[in-house]
Amino acid sequence: MEALPTYLESFWHSGGGTMGISILVMLSTFLALGTIFVYRIWLHPLSGFPGPKCCSVSSIPVAWAQLRGRNHEFVSSLHRKYGSVVRISPSELSFISGAAWNDIYSRSKGRPALERDRTFFNDMLVDPETITMANEATHSRIRRAMAPAFSPRALLEQEPIIQANIKLLMDKLEARAGSGGAPTDLRAWFNYTTFDLIGDLAFGESFGCLATSTCHEWVQFVLDHFYTSTLLHVVHRFHPFNRVLAALLPKSLIEKRKAHDSMTLTKVHRRLEVQGRRNDFTQHLLDAAEAGTLSSREVEKQASVLILAGSETTSVALTFAIYLVLTNKPVLDQLNDELHSTFKEEQEINLLSVNQLKYLHAVIQEALRFCPPISNGFPRQTPPQGATVDGMFIPGKTVVNINHWAAYRSPRNFTLPEQFLPERWLGDPRFDEDAKDVFQPFSVGPRNCIGKKFAYDSMKLILAKFLWRFKPTLLDKSRSWLAHQPTFVSFHQPPLLVDLEIKGSDAFPVRE
């Protein structure tokens, strides 16, 4: 090999060669990044969709918003600036129109519903044998087996269990109100109730939160699980480094999940030992197993989904609703008037009668619009050949989603969107132009929430009985409770402190 010229050899040994290689590497890196930026901004199949350039070239902005629990606010701000469809990452579009719901989540014109985005529904998130992760055929089979547990008839059969847990809540709160002690944290007490209720219906026994006035460890696990889910959603955005990034997550989070799985199995096995029929969710799964529709393993795997889906989100919705009621006196007064005009005594409030309360239903609807518990939605992915969403052709392999918060707070969809106004659901002409078809808090299509009626009915019962028995006063320190709560799958709510006064016998005069 011919020797380097003397001046080059001198340059190399003086360190110039190393510096030259460093410069070459830097230039190559800048060239590669520049090529990626140019492609994603001007040549990518999604380059024609509006959105900030920083989101077009990288997933970092949306990932950072997710990590801070601010993704709902971030995406909402983009829609206010760019319109009804926004490119929020290189391969992801967010929609806020009513028409997009069916295009994304429902079967349409012979085609199946769009597949779930595997960045979001990744294999590290939930057990693959659960209804959440199942493919379309398996999902349909499991859902058919679970559906009888959530039918109107089944709910009436489950009412004694539901009423018993709510009565325990009311009795515990009444004891606190009568003691003249410390303020009551409604966030905690609603959490106790929904976890005990779901535990009772899923496992045949409550978690004992109400009885002991303390959180069961499972309550904290669910919050940890939601935060871990957010971390996994973020790291899976950065393929092919997702596995490496996931390995950097605290091992304690993985250990907590294993402990949860073990506890679930123990409780399911204990429920299976119960002799005779019991009117709860598990009984219907057992019936399906006996009929050969589900395997015993599939029965076990669905139990944890029931806890994750049915407890925390209902508690979050309840707490939002009572806060919004307590900070809007006309709403509180009208709810009390409706209760007084409908019932003579608390015992009349049941699953059938509570559904006569039209204003209460409107209050819950408006609370779900104003503060949707699952605010960021569940993304899907278009097939390789592409799909039409909201009248627009969307290229293949594009992640598409409807962000509940952004859709429900958009002036494109609702009149006075930043105001809590239950009248919008009662035919008030001020809201005739509202795009109410965009309001889908339980989603649509074959994977919509199977427990929708259970959630509505349990919230109505709890709120009606609570307002029948108590006169709550929000503490000053909780006046700004709503501001800037972070969301990791669902919202992480701080304590909601109130003083409780037991209503006297004259609070609801006997009807003529």
From Swiss-Prot:
It is found in: Membrane. Its cofactor is heme. Pfam families: p450. Heme binds at C449. Keywords: Glycoprotein, Heme, Iron, Membrane, Metal-binding, Monooxygenase, Oxidoreductase, Transmembrane, Transmembrane helix. One of its GO terms (cellular component) is membrane. InterPro entries: Cyt_P450 (IPR001128), Cyt_P450_CS (IPR017972), Cyt_P450_E_grp-I (IPR002401), Cyt_P450_sf (IPR036396), Cytochrome_P450_monoxygenase (IPR050121). It comes from the Eukaryota. The chain crosses the membrane at residues 19-39. Belongs to the cytochrome P450 family. This is Cytochrome P450 monooxygenase astD. It comes from Aspergillus oryzae (strain ATCC 42149 / RIB 40).
